[in-house]
Amino acid sequence: MIGLFLNLLDTQNEKDKFIKLYDKYKNMLYWISYGKTQSCQDAEECVQETFFYVAKHFEKIGDVNSSQTKGYLATIVTGFSIDVYNKSKKYGRIDIENNNIAENLSYFDNIETVELSSAIESVLSEEEKIYIYLKYVYGYKSAEIAEIYNVTDISVRKKLERA
């Protein structure tokens, strides 16, 4: 499967970097996804979707070992996992209160950011939190977020506006 992803990359350096990224994070992403979907098949599908998306947008990956890259990947796989879970159940939301992305990945470096994060965590829905992280932490455009979650750009902008 990794061969498919490598075909999306242009240079040998990118391919080598992708292999390192894949080897380093595939298990972590699987367990994050499995925690949300409670299904081995769905978790594997979400991990593959995550790496496919990353290969298509590989220019957004910085240092493979950085906490920002780790958080970026975790956010994407979480989004895919929630989407798969909701589609399979067709109702309800995933309770991930005890699985706070910010706490698990430690990508907040100072007190002000931690305070802002806790305010976000207590007020926003899970979908709004993910949109906020992708937009303001990782610099995604609303159109890119819409593409990830198969929703309209207008829907993403409205959610961000309400958040």
Regions found by a protein language model. Give the residues of each.
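A short, charge-rich alpha-helical start-of-domain segment used by transcription regulators
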Residues: 6-31, 35, 129
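Short amphipathic alpha helix immediately N-terminal
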Residues: 122-144, 148
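Arg/Lys-rich amphipathic alpha helix in sigma70-family domain 2
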Residues: 75-96
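Internal acidic/polar
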Residues: 91-121
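Amphipathic, Lys/Arg- and hydrophobic-enriched alpha-helical face
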Residues: 22-41, 57-60, 121
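Structural recognition of an alpha-helix C-terminal capping motif at a helix-to-coil junction
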Residues: 31, 45-52, 56, 67-79
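Sigma70-family region 2
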Residues: 10, 51-67, 88
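DNA-recognition helix of helix-turn-helix
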Residues: 82, 143-163
